[in-house]
């Protein structure tokens, strides 16, 4: 089964983004084999552009605005648009808009499965995902649109920081902010917000910042140079990978004029708990730099976000962005997001649930379908992770012994050999959608090469031999292996999401595979798996784990801080030898400005990571972006996920809806 489109990948980097037919593959238990190449369902051709082709920063003599905000100006509720714009707004270039300058008005209909925890993203709160976070946050740099940039120019893009400069020794980075941008309440955005973000959030161990304390390197300090300039000082040379850490979400400052008075460092009556909850989901509107402001929240029903009248971005005809007036998020489930999009009652879906793929293929063939779907390359994957922390979250001697077992690479190899990826894939959806995954970078990553992925494929006999050699034998004859020397039965809990259907199906399929090698699995479904990984109270975990870009959230995938990755928390003094190698490679990526060196180090990381089975890769699949045909300026080649999720990759502020009115001057 294939998909035909008029687009074909053209660039060398994009030619690596392949992927989709599942193969039944065997492997010997002793030899090293590499992951076999897959076949792609995507036939897209993308003309990559230069980084300066997307946007610039430029002033206009006069600005246009939507009829909605103009009515507020006329009523005396807002200053004129010229007074709301920064000195030099971010300006989108028309040549990269597939449908050209947009039209004002209309409602973007979205469906998500998340729920807003609160709006203090500085303290790590989730706003519900699915686009809410991306629409209200703005970060210093930006990664999402990099999927369309030539590989030799694919460094992080400017955003709130319009430019920057490295010192000659690369031990300091000076960044210059856009001048005169305003928060949605009209307050000026400046380095006071940067100072609060860094010193009172990132550097405060009591705040669960999205950017870990040492993500830019231990000893990194911030120096404020003026209202719109600041400098990072590092203990050792750094490179452009640092800029990637300053993109969504870690590099998103919050409104200091709102949040600073709520922080314990500035308010003796405040606690860190009260600070974290200082922007509750029940109190709206909030203050943001994003294109849209949350104004209505009905629990488990909907979220409404309306255009930010102070948004600091424009198009080349000096029309203030965004184009459409509001987004309505229906709060149901992630699977319902795709169902609604296919039915025409939702406008957008990152189709990540392979169970819906067959229906999407049918819709593609129907000229009357309200939605168009474009399948990309294999960018989503599922892994089985083992808790590698020696003591974090351990509550018994049995659990401590299990952890030591998980830290043994031979045991991890045995588990990988036990996984029948073909059966797993077909249990999720029948068809040519799946391919084995070895862990690490997905096949669609520009940093992935199949020859770098060491693969311990399905071989139950080999798995049993390895376990026998580890002394894990059924010493009491009940059909379940025991820990060495007549120890307890080998019973292992497997954490997985109870709300994502693919995760549920994979966990169910894994049960018989564990039983076939004498291990008793106990499934542990949860609607809040983060709570378990945060406190370390888990053994194994099946989840989606897609690493696409080497420089993006590197601390989430490698142990560059003591609290990451999720499968090895509290790792100070606890790293395995191969993890120390991974850390050194990661430091190399963070220290270089040479993209070819980044690619070489990424290849090394993939080899080390997969040979040592850092996580057990299960399956990987393509994703499809579903867009209602009434939505304009959605680039047809935008991936569901690469440098960032599609909501950032397609630049939602440039989306417009086919019914509304043209901008008025």
How would you label these PLM feature ranges?
Residues 618:
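Glycine-rich and polybasic anion-binding loops at the starts of cofactor/ligand-binding domains
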Residues 30-59, 71, 75, 146, ...:
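Extracytoplasmic/periplasmic ligand-capture domains
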